[in-house]
């Protein structure tokens, strides 16, 4: 088939370039607290803006994605969303995971103080373990697929 004809068919069928965009969404399932955390991994900030607007907060702006990561807190009980362009820097991942931890705990009505510090620690531990377990599986699957 002629590539020009294929391109024309795609354009006329309303095919968006978004289907060709590489991104990954993982869900860190709630454990003690019944609130999942979504993690959107993509360098495509236009896609990230669209995803967060559709799934959590219609007021986000492109400038909200100017950093090395961002966390958008729960609204009306919807899952908070962490955006990361990559998962390469553990310090940035952990930075965003602490924001998500604080958000989950606020959603649950638990204020950080000396008597709740351990609960915050357990939630952070849970989210971190969930994140790295899923990232490890994704990387293993990608490696297996390339073989």
Locate each region found by the language model:
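A short, structured loop/turn motif at beta-sheet edges
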Residues: 93-95
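Post-HExxH zinc-binding segment in Zn-dependent metallohydrolases
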Residues: 112-145
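Active-site scaffold of zinc-dependent metalloenzymes
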Residues: 45-90, 100-104
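Sec-dependent signal peptide cleavage junction
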Residues: 19-23, 142-147
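Sec-dependent signal peptide recognition
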Residues: 1-8
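Short, charged/polar N-terminal "headpieces" of proteins
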Residues: 18-54
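Catalytic Zn2+-binding segment of zinc metalloproteases
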Residues: 97-114
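C-terminal motif of bacterial Sec signal peptides marking the signal peptidase cleavage site
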Residues: 13-14
């Amino acid at each position: 088939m002629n590539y020009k004809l294929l391109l024309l068919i795609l354009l006329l069928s309303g095919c968006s370039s978004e289907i060709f965009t590489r991104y990954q969404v993982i869900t860190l399932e709630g454990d003690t607290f019944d609130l999942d955390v979504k993690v959107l991994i993509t360098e495509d900030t236009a896609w990230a803006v669209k995803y967060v607007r559709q799934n959590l907060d219609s007021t986000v702006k492109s400038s909200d994605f100017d950093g090395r990561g961002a966390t958008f807190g729960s609204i009306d009980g919807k899952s908070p969303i962490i955006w990361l362009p990559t998962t390469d820097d553990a310090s940035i991942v952990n930075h965003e995971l602490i924001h998500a931890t604080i958000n989950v705990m606020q959603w649950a009505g638990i204020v950080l103080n000396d008597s709740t510090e351990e609960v915050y620690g357990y939630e952070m531990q849970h989210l971190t373990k969930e994140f790295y377990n899923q990232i490890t599986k994704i990387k293993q699957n990608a490696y297996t697929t390339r073989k």
